[in-house]
Amino acid sequence: MNYKEQVIGLWSDMNKQSWNDIHRYFDNDAVINWNNTNERFNVEEFVRANSEYPGDWSIKVERLECIENLVISVVKVHLKNDDVSFHATSFFEFNNGKIKLLNEYWGDDGKSPQWRIDKQIGKPINYI
């Protein structure tokens, strides 16, 4: 399985909330950083943080790029039975066929700030 396929598999297992399958993608001493909240996890902590996250969600991969041993993904995470959604941009660095380092950047989806709406700066991405 190439790096891109591994990231697709990881997101698929995350979407299914198959927590016992997540470890196989990571090196034993992998580091996972959630940069927005200044948190660093090992694999066990990463799985626990995700498995204990409240609610049920769906994950859709919107973009995937691969540059040598680096895979960059953009996913949309939507909480089922709720209007809440997020986007995550993730940088997966591989070593010896496993994820060695993962840096993730999360953002809440929402409408534009009122000051930009008032000034009529920009328009919705899906305006057609």
Question: Which role fits each region the language model picked out?
Answer:
Residues 1-128:
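C-terminal and inter-domain tail/linker signature
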